[in-house]
Amino acid sequence: MDDIITQVSPDNAESAPILQEQQQQQNSQYEGNEEDYGDSLIHLNIQENHYFITRDQLMSLPESLLLCLFPSGVFLDRCGQVITNLTRDDEVYIVNFPPDCFEYIMEIYTKAHDDLYNHPVEKFFDRPSSSFVSNAKGFFGLSSNNSISSNNEQDILHQKPAIIVLREDLDYYCVPQEEFQFDSTNEENNEDLLRHFMAQVKMAAGSYLTSKTSIFQGLYSSNRLKQQQQQQKIEKGSNSSSNTKSTSKKLGPAEQHLMDMLCSSGFTKETCWGNRTQETGKTVISSLSLCRLANETTEGFRQKFNEAKAKWEAEHKPSQDNFITPMQSNISINSLSASKSNSTISTARNLTSGSTAPATARDKRKSRLSKLADNVRSHSSSRHSSQTRSKPPELPKLYDLVPKPNINAKLLLFWRKPARKCWWGEEDIELEVEVFGSWKDESKKIIELILPTNVDPEAELHKIIVPVRLHIRRVWTLELSVIGVQ
């Protein structure tokens, strides 16, 4: 079976570890004062949208996102010069990253940080926090002294907020399926007309692809899958329409395995991209989805726990109001006092009667001592029984109230190890474009492009529908980000 996804080789990522060298250089001036270093603000200018973020916030983002923010691995100013010594007054300039995508990232990570610190998981368990959840520092829990060597990696997915980072980089190439004729013999003008036509086609194709927001729709467009399906049709011969439909929706084993892993971790087959943007002036579409792993740190799990706890308390409240008070112990004590008094009186009488029957007196004395011991045992058992009946029932353990989340352990393969999967696909579509010309012979797919002659060129634009074949290359990057663990 094919690999699910190909791990990114460190040799192919020139700036992995991103910003590490620059961080080490600047760390020297903050020695002895780590909190000032981590809390120092960084001014980001993303397409003239200004954001202020702490160093810990920035460095807690996963590597796949840092590479998108800083492709060269360094901070750049407005002029494109490297900022070697970053200060509070410096402005880090980011050109090719959409501001709404950055806001989407910060929204998800801020919520995860809030759950980590304001709703600690250890309060659900009978374990001390020091042994259950390691202490973390900073906005996203970045701490140089933090270590997970003592924690089981499986438990990390239950103890810490985790985010599945899925990114798609899509490149598309447009191939018109028609021929062109020109009314002018000037080759330079004809090239301008053709360039304008292709620009309109690329813009329309970009809008079409951007509107396709379904995440898993791209998996079905692989050329390899289409070739396998065509081969199956040839081998089976003529198929019914129902068989054709079921075959067209079948994924390969690698794609199906990847889809099942994501769907078992919070995604659904209908999940859409959280952010999908086309780069200005390029046939490139970047998509991002941040899926919070459905573990014990989520708000949904807390709601289930609180509902189950309230239901359990409501069911056991009547029995708590009818607990038996320890009356039997008082009765036993009174019986014990009476027994002691009677034994004292009997002993005095026997002493006055003399020693006429010493054997009989000893037997009676043993009998009285046996009764006294029985009374003591009865008193002890009665008190224990009363205390047992008066003790309220204890709240069940966490997983007795709420089922333990079923988390796919294979996600740990992508923790701190971003992985990629690349495939090609093609699609034949029809696009509506505005061009300087019209169909000369639509049956033969011939378009005539005409050079505009009016003062207002836009008046000579005509809307036509043209067939286009799209060649699409998709690159998926998958990474697991765990909040609060360095």
UniProtKB/Swiss-Prot annotation:
Residues 1-34, 227-253, 345-397 are annotated as: Disordered. The gene is WHI2. Interacts with MSN2 and PSR1. Disruption phenotype: Negative mutants fail to enter the G0 phase under conditions of carbon limitation. Present with 1800 molecules/cell in log phase SD medium. This is Growth regulation protein. Plays a role in the coordination of growth and proliferation. Required for entry into G0 phase under conditions of carbon limitation. Involved in the general stress response; acts together with PSR1 to activate stress response element (STRE)-mediated gene expression, possibly through dephosphorylation of MSN2. One of its GO terms (cellular component) is nucleus. Residues 20-31, 227-250 have a biased composition (Low complexity). GO terms for biological process: actin filament organization; cellular hyperosmotic response; cellular response to amino acid starvation; cellular response to heat; cellular response to oxidative stress; endocytosis; mitophagy; negative regulation of TORC1 signaling. The lineage of its organism: Eukaryota, Fungi, Dikarya, Ascomycota, Saccharomycotina. Signal peptide: none annotated. Belongs to the WHI2 family.
